[in-house]
Amino acid sequence: MKLDVQILDARLHEQLPQYATPGSAGLDLRACLDAPLTLEPGSTHLIPTGMAIHLADPGYAALILPRSGMGHKHGIVLGNLVGLIDSDYQGQLMISTWNRGDTAFVLNPMERLAQLVIVPVVQAELNIVDAFAESERGAGGFGSTGRH
């Protein structure tokens, strides 16, 4: 798949967004900051990525996901947990960043902060029914299948 990308921050020309390995599902996104930013415990910030994308095809969407090391080692996760980018969005990608940890974290300019994953999308056509055909699970919700 080809992805139309606008580079909005000239520094990205030297460090184009890329997949870290041939098996990586996520394209690394960088913090396009002008200076280091201290993320205090409990604080949230919108961090620019310096790029915009246009998927154009309604059969695709993009997800902004946290980098596992940032969350596990430093408590830096996404403020919205997952960022959903619709196929018709054309603005700059922003990363909602939340320091859920108990110590301040310094985010440096051009540091890899999150990753972008392209996923297929199926838009459902609603079929209104009076009842569902019975299934083994039925309406059993949280924890209804037991611990394994």
Swiss-Prot record:
Cofactor: Mg(2+)
Keywords: Hydrolase, Magnesium, Metal-binding, Nucleotide metabolism
EC number: 3.6.1.23
Catalytic activity: dUTP + H2O = dUMP + diphosphate + H(+)
UniProt: substrate binding residues: 67-69, 80, 84-86, 94
A GO term for molecular function: magnesium ion binding
Short name of any one Pfam family annotated for the protein: dUTPase
Enzyme class: hydrolase
One of the GO biological process terms: dUMP biosynthetic process
Domain of life according to the entry: Bacteria
Pathway stated in the Swiss-Prot or TrEMBL entry: Pyrimidine metabolism; dUMP biosynthesis; dUMP from dCTP (dUTP route): step 2/2
Similarity field: Belongs to the dUTPase family.
Role according to the record: This enzyme is involved in nucleotide metabolism: it produces dUMP, the immediate precursor of thymidine nucleotides and it decreases the intracellular concentration of dUTP so that uracil cannot be incorporated into DNA.
Name listed for the protein in its UniProt record: Deoxyuridine 5'-triphosphate nucleotidohydrolase
Lineage: Bacteria, Pseudomonadati, Pseudomonadota, Betaproteobacteria, Burkholderiales
Gene that specifies this protein: dut
